[in-house]
Amino acid sequence: MSEENNSQNSNPPNPENGEIASEIQKLQEQAEKFKNDYLYLRAEFENYKRNAIKERSELMKYGGERLVRDLLEVVDNFDRALSVNVSAENFNTFKQGVDMTAQELKSLLQRHNVIEIPAHGAPFDPSVHEALSSEATDQMAPGHIVRVFKKPYKLHDKVIRPGQVVVAKKPE
């Protein structure tokens, strides 16, 4: 009787068991592949983040290199001008050289998108100008700039230095 029970309880070989085992094996291999792909992508992303941080840091550190290189040319011209012994005979030539160097500097700033904002005679704008004082005058409409101590400048669209100005007011 025990043999009968054993033969009844033991499962005969089932073709589905082999298919299930095969399917499990495939799924385990696929899961392992997904895990490896995930780990690879995670490592790639970490490298990307590290490189992006390094690149941004270098951009912050060396971003002004082109401007500085251009400014050094102007500095060289000023150094040459300062090495000249100025006399009455060469004063006009010296002044012309300094004027040319100043123009070169202004041109360089424009090439780097630093633009002077016209101020004299313009209406006072607190987002662009800093009023140092006011002056009673008939020469200029009230609220307009009568004198400029420091010119305002912008870099692209941003004011990087407000102008220091005197604003006209109506005489009393």
UniProtKB/Swiss-Prot annotation:
Protein's UniProt keywords contain Membrane: no
InterPro entries associated with the record: GrpE, GrpE_coiled_coil, GrpE_head
Stretches with biased composition (Low complexity): 1-11
Keywords from the named record: Chaperone, Cytoplasm, Stress response
Pfam family of the protein (one): GrpE
GO terms assigned for molecular function: adenyl-nucleotide exchange factor activity; protein homodimerization activity; protein-folding chaperone binding; unfolded protein binding
Keyword field contains Chaperone: yes
One Gene Ontology biological process: protein folding
NCBIfam families: PRK14140.1
Function: Participates actively in the response to hyperosmotic and heat shock by preventing the aggregation of stress-denatured proteins, in association with DnaK and GrpE. It is the nucleotide exchange factor for DnaK and may function as a thermosensor. Unfolded proteins bind initially to DnaJ; upon interaction with the DnaJ-bound protein, DnaK hydrolyzes its bound ATP, resulting in the formation of a stable complex. GrpE releases ADP from DnaK; ATP binding to DnaK triggers the release of the substrate protein, thus completing the reaction cycle.
HAMAP family given in the database record: GrpE
Subunit-level organization: Homodimer.
Record protein name field: Protein GrpE
Species: Bdellovibrio bacteriovorus (strain ATCC 15356 / DSM 50701 / NCIMB 9529 / HD100)
Origin organism lineage: Bacteria, Pseudomonadati, Bdellovibrionota, Bdellovibrionia, Bdellovibrionales
Gene name of this polypeptide: grpE
